[in-house]
Regions:
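Acidic donor-binding loop at a coil-to-helix junction in glycosyltransferase catalytic cores
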Residues: 255-261
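N-terminal signal-anchor transmembrane helix
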Residues: 32-93, 108
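Membrane-embedded multi-pass helical conduit in multi-pass membrane proteins
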Residues: 7-25, 38-41, 58, 334-429
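Short aromatic/hydrophobic "clamp" motif used to bind/position activated sugar donors
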Residues: 160
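Active-site donor/metal-binding and catalytic loop motifs
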Residues: 276-298
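Catalytic donor-sugar/metal-binding loop of nucleotide-sugar-dependent glycosyltransferases
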Residues: 253, 265-282
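Long helical/loop segments within the catalytic core of UDP-sugar-dependent glycosyltransferases
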Residues: 119-129, 135-136, 141-157, 171-255, ...
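Acidic donor-binding segment of Leloir-type glycosyltransferases
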Residues: 87-136, 140
Length: 455
């Protein structure tokens, strides 16, 4: 306190300019950190090699057995194509474990239809044994973590993977994953996940922004986290050695069990996480179809759940078990980032308005605009990132998509900030309700078939 008072009087600044300078410093920290994370893959010389998948394990040399858990609830419209895709894996040693709720009749029937089809093919062509194990159980208040842990009870493979209901998974993913385990000696492998639908029409303006969030997360930021030794894992395309997962007690019962598991494995077990990304091996998903519509799938309510999950992990304090002070500070900052970014989004324009309307020193007023330098860097990276995304995935972006990244970014950040505010409020009042993100399979060329429950 004495040092702070000394700086205050040395600068001889009134209270308001001092506060404005503090706000500017905070905004610069948040903006600079975001820019550094998203540019990590470009500015780090060996980043490309670091996140590159190794060559696949040669045929006949596969050693690891994989259990791929697919937790499902109300997913009849998308799961058939997902299971068909998973059954085309080139790795010979894998099993698909589908975890279902007993009252979800339409999804159960859809999965059983695929099982029957697979059994028929086995009889006719004798191409492979049945790959699918179906687990149906009762849950009073079902969560993804509960269904994952129930499926873990029957898993016997060396590695446990998680696949979501609408995922399009590359056929050679597992042979490359085994090669990455072998090359790095990792305990956990996090593969790339990419949202695919850029959005068509004014009502889908937000989708291109969400696509690029994922693009920069998995091409750059995830590698940075792995380097730091602290990785909040993604919800799918994550592979964990079964012994470690069982020692950890399975997935934490959290609304963001993926993040919670990553925190636990990093902080309490010192797990080594390897990450890899390439367009050819990326798991492809869809952006939520709407901003607020809970029935079809909402970006806002999905983000509310994510932010609450990060906030819960931050307050729980398991990240404080990281071994060094630097790692503790970085882990805490990573978990607090959604809240800090939302706060910064509000403070940047507020500080400028106050600085221009209330008498302040000219130098202080000019400094209010400094955070817009990092904002400009982020916008430029968005434009370049969209071009790179389209080049890698064979997509075509319109002028509208590029214009949206420039002119509608504040609106997108307002949506995310609103979700963060709701998340903080819900956490404060002990509201644990959340909304499952719906699927429309907009990332697939053809609409998924619909199944009705058996009579």
């Amino acid at each position: 306190m004495a040092a702070a008072a000394g700086i205050w009087y040395a600068l001889a600044l009134p209270a308001l300019p001092t506060v404005l300078l503090g706000v500017t410093a905070f905004n610069l920290l948040v903006g600079t950190t975001e820019a550094m994370w998203r540019l990590y893959g470009w500015r780090t010389p060996n980043a490309g090699e670091q996140i590159a998948w190794p060559d696949p394990v040669p045929p006949g040399r596969e050693q690891l057995a994989f259990d791929l858990i697919v937790p499902l609830r109300d997913e009849a419209n998308v799961i058939v194509d997902t299971l068909h895709g998973l059954m085309r894996q080139s790795h010979p040693r894998y099993r698909i474990v589908v975890s279902l709720c007993d009252n979800d009749e339409s999804t159960i029937e859809a999965v059983r239809a695929v099982v029957r089809e697979n059994l028929h093919d086995n009889v006719q062509r004798t191409i492979r044994d049945n790959r699918i194990t179906v687990i149906v159980d009762h849950y009073a208040n079902p969560t993804k973590a509960q269904q994952l842990n129930r499926a873990l009870e029957v898993c016997m493979g060396d590695v446990i993977g998680v696949i979501d209901a609408e995922d399009d998974v590359a056929e050679d993913l597992l042979v490359h994953t085994e090669a990455l385990f072998e090359r790095t000696g990792a305990d956990v492998v996090q593969g790339g996940v990419q949202l695919m639908n850029l959005g068509r029409g004014l009502d889908k303006w937000f989708q291109v922004h969400n696509v690029l969030e994922y693009f920069f997360w998995f091409t750059s930021r995830m590698a940075f986290h792995a380097d730091s030794g602290f990785v909040p894992l993604g919800g799918n395309t994550v592979f964990v050695r079964r012994g470690l997962l069982e020692e950890a007690g399975g997935w934490p019962l959290s609304i963001t069990e993926d993040c919670a598991l990553g925190v636990q494995l990093s902080a309490e077990f010192g797990a080594k996480v390897a990450t890899a990304y390439s367009a050819a091996l990326t798991t492809r998903e869809e952006v939520p179809p709407s901003i607020f519509n809970k029935k079809v799938g909402s970006l806002f309510w999905q983000r509310d759940r994510w932010v609450r999950g990060f906030l819960q992990e931050f307050i729980a304090g398991r990240w404080l078990k990281m071994p060094t002070l630097r790692q503790k500070a970085l882990a805490g900052y990573i978990l607090a980032t959604p809240i800090l970014q939302a706060l910064s989004f509000i403070l940047v324009p507020t500080a400028i308005i106050v600085g221009l309307t209330v008498p302040t020193p000219i130098a202080v007023a000019l400094l209010m605009f400094a955070p817009y330098i990092t904002l400009g860097i982020i916008v430029c990276s968005q434009l370049i990132g969209l071009h790179d995304f389209c080049a890698q995935y064979g997509k075509r972006a319109s002028r509208w998509h590029y214009a949206s990244l420039i002119f509608l970014m504040p609106l997108y950040q307002l949506v995310l900030s609103g979700a963060a505010a709701v998340a903080v409020y819900k956490y404060a009042v002990g509201d644990n309700t959340w909304y499952k993100t719906g699927r429309l399979a907009e990332h697939r060329a053809m609409p998924a078939p619909e199944y009705e429950s058996a009579a």
